[in-house]
Amino acid sequence: EGFNWAASSSATENYPTSQYDNGKNGKCAKLETRLTGSLGAMVGMPIAAGNLFIGEFDMTNALTSPLKATHFGTPFCYKPSRLKGWYKYKAGERFYENGGYTDRKDVMNIYAIFYEGESYNEAGEVTEVILDGNLPNQNYEHPSMVALALISNPHETDDWEAFDIPFDYQRYGKEIDETKLAKGKYKLSIIF
C-alpha cells in the first residue's frame, strides 16, 4: 500500500507524515516512507519520506529540488539549550537511492538548528537567510549557523526511547547578539 500524490481524498493515516494514537503518552507523529503511486513514478520520485520540521515548504521547488523546498526555521527570541523528546524507529526493508533500491540500510535523524536569520553584504544590505534540506549533506556547515543539537546514536528500537540533546554552540564559535535575539533575528528549526 502506498501514498498516492494524486489521491487527495486518501485517508490522512496513508500520508508519509500523520497523527498516530500509540505515542509514548497519548498521540504522536508517525513518519513513514511511502510509495507515491503513478504520479510520483512519472516524475521520478517513487517514494516520499515522512518528515516534520519547523519552517515552510516551497511547492515551486518540490518536484525539481525537494531538499531546497524545505525552508528551515522561524524567528526565535530565546537561546535554546536542549532538544528533548521520545522516539521509536524501525528502518524500512529496502533503501531507495539514485533511481533504484540498494543494499544500504536507512538511518533516521533528529536535529535542531539555531542560526542567524539575516546576512549583510559589503554595502550593508540585509538579506534573509534560509537554510534548507541540503544542510545535513553539507555536514551542518553554513556561515549563519550558531548552534546544532544532533542525535548522536540514531538506532532502531522497539520501545520508546528518550533523547536529550544539548545545543552545541562551541562548534560554530559565535557569540549571541542579545539585541538581535530580542528582535527575533535568529531562527530555530527542529527537524525529524
Question: For the regions a protein language model found, what residue spans apply to each?
Answer:
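Extended, low-complexity, turn-rich repeat/linker tracts enriched in Gly/Pro/Ser/Thr and Asp/Glu
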Residues: Y89-E97, Y101-K105, E118-N121
